[in-house]
């Protein structure tokens, strides 16, 4: 606290303090600018400076409050100068506080962002999981069980059997099951008749891979839909069903005509059984009772009884075996037809050789015919000689004309060359009229050539 003896001295002191404060203002502003540019100043020092300045302001305010009664006689100019100095100080302090707060906030934000980025990258590297799949294990589990193969089970169990005549995909397994059930029924029904030929003689016209034992545990009365595969079956096209029925009827017709069409291929009662049966792919149908004479007839009856397509038509399924059998029958029929045509052609040729009429060469009619033929041949030969002679003479005359024309052309070319030489010499003549005529003549000759 300053002890002033008189109001005049107090006023002088206040003026000096105000002047000192005004002189100190530029360094304060420079300090604010330096704080903006320089970031090395710590926040603790800034807070201490702010506290000191606030204490100075409080002291000045207390002095002003204590000495207000004494300053009533001073001029209004001193009051205005003090107010201006206080406002300038407050404004400078406010700016310093804002700059310090902004700098500290920016530094803190940058530090926090760097820390978060580093920790996040570390956590990502540590917590990432590698995704691996055991593809071989999945494939093995998916295709290990043959019962779950569905439609592929037929292709796996039958090497090249039904691959050529497979219908749309949903029908193969069901058709195979129905054919297997029919095979079992035929084995039970015809096992005693054929003398042990149930397994080998049943479905003799069918491809043998149909007898696969992958589904023998199924009941005969089980429905078609109880198959292990869960594939939905599409309805059969009526046109396709009609085509199958026609093929089955053609097969039955071919089988019924065994005594006439396939008589040469069989040695049994009806020509359909034996060592070289063309309808079952060359497979034999052995029987245990070799001395029994009724074996061929029993196998033939069994064969013809199995040709009906009523079983599969009842289940609304395509008759795969019927289509294959009809195809084989058509092939055999075409081969037989070709062989028959070849034999007929050979027989016709032999018949023509042996069927010539016997002509008596001593008769007058034969002599007259031979004379007429000889005269005609002689005349035709004379005419041919005359034509050849005329052609030769014409060729000779043309060759002579050609030689004459060639000679004439050579003479004319020589004359032309001579005239050109003459005109070339006359072009340099002293008379301009002569030279002009020669040039024009040469030009016309060149254009004409």
From Swiss-Prot:
One Gene Ontology biological process: regulation of transcription by RNA polymerase II
Please tell me whether the keyword Transferase is annotated for this protein. no
What keywords are assigned to this protein?
A: Activator, DNA-binding, Nucleus, Transcription, Transcription regulation, Ubl conjugation
The PTM entry states: Ubiquitination/deubiquitination regulates border cell migration. Ubiquitination is stimulated by trbl, which leads to proteasomal degradation and inhibits border cell migration. Deubiquitination by Usp47, leads to its stabilization and promotes border cell migration.
Annotated spans, Leucine-zipper: 398-405
Record's compositionally biased regions (Basic and acidic residues): 357-368
Q: Name one Pfam family in it.
A: bZIP_2
What is its subcellular localisation? Answer: Nucleus
| Gene Ontology molecular function terms on file | DNA-binding transcription factor activity, RNA polymerase II-specific; RNA polymerase II cis-regulatory region sequence-specific DNA binding; RNA polymerase II transcription regulatory region sequence-specific DNA binding
Q: Its quaternary structure?
A: Binds DNA as a dimer and can form stable heterodimers. Interacts with trbl.
Stated family: Belongs to the bZIP family. C/EBP subfamily.
Protein name, please?
CCAAT/enhancer-binding protein
Where is the organism placed in the taxonomic lineage, from the top?
Eukaryota, Metazoa, Ecdysozoa, Arthropoda, Hexapoda
